[in-house]
């Protein structure tokens, strides 16, 4: 039997992590692995680029509400998730005030997952996956809501640009079997934030993959030939407009 992999992702709006995920999916061999993709919300321009052989799991109501406006949660009756998110915002703000940092406060995402994940149902609970991948922070959901033999958490973040509550977040990273970093620089800043993980052999570097198939599909979405001809063939050069 082929290894069975689950990949957990928020949604597929246009973004760096989303593009990296599509690249990874296109690089995987459907003859060698089976992949289930769980998206918290089935939205985003990148949805159309999911390879046909990937099994996209159906949405689950609680997950689709995780990043919707609080007012929308209240209107739809998701009071517990709304309350958990408000509490997360309060705790995150309290922790941020104590740190005396001038960096943007990114700890709110960790705390939101910390308090909302216990309220969510399991993802495809009848299946125990050979590998579960949490492709974007926060990583509590893949840790707590997926049955898997091994787990990998992905890092896309330059930790010199944000503030996180490293002490509170460390236990989540520590419970993963592996941590995939997209570059040596990302690894460096991550280990500066979580130095105790340096000697654990958890970190593997997996560079983002830009699939030629994906590039061709994006190029075919919209025909801009008319616009190029309108401006004299679309010739460009450095420091000169079309």
Residue spans of the language-model regions?
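N-terminal strand-loop element at the rim of the active site
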Residues: 10-14, 33-105
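Alpha-helix capping/helix-boundary segments
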Residues: 43, 138-139, 185-187
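Short N-terminal targeting/anchoring amphipathic segment
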Residues: 109, 120-137
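Membrane-proximal helix-turn-helix segments that form the acceptor-binding/catalytic region
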Residues: 117-128, 160-182, 186
């Amino acid at each position: 039997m082929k290894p069975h992999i689950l990949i957990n992702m928020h949604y597929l709006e246009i973004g760096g992590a989303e593009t990296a995920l599509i690249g990874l999916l296109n690089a995987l061999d459907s003859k060698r692995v089976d992949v289930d993709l769980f998206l918290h919300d089935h939205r985003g321009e990148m949805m159309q680029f999911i390879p046909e052989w990937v099994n996209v799991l159906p949405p689950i109501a609680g997950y689709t509400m995780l990043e919707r406006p609080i007012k929308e949660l209240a209107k739809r009756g998701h009071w517990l998730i709304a309350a958990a998110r408000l509490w997360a915002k309060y705790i995150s703000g309290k922790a941020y005030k104590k740190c005396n940092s001038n960096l943007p406060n990114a700890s709110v995402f960790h705390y939101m997952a910390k308090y909302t994940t216990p309220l969510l149902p399991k993802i495809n609970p009848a299946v125990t996956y050979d590998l579960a991948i949490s492709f974007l922070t926060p990583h509590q959901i893949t840790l707590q809501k997926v049955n898997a033999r091994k787990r990998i958490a992905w890092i896309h973040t330059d930790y010199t640009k944000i503030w996180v509550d490293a002490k509170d977040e460390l236990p989540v990273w520590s419970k993963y079997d592996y941590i995939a970093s997209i570059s040596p620089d990302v690894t460096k800043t991550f280990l500066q934030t979580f130095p105790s993980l340096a000697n654990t052999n958890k970190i593997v570097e997996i560079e983002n993959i830009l699939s030629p198939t994906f590039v061709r599909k994006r190029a075919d979405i919209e025909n801009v030939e008319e616009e190029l001809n309108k401006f004299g063939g679309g010739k460009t050069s450095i420091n000169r407009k079309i």
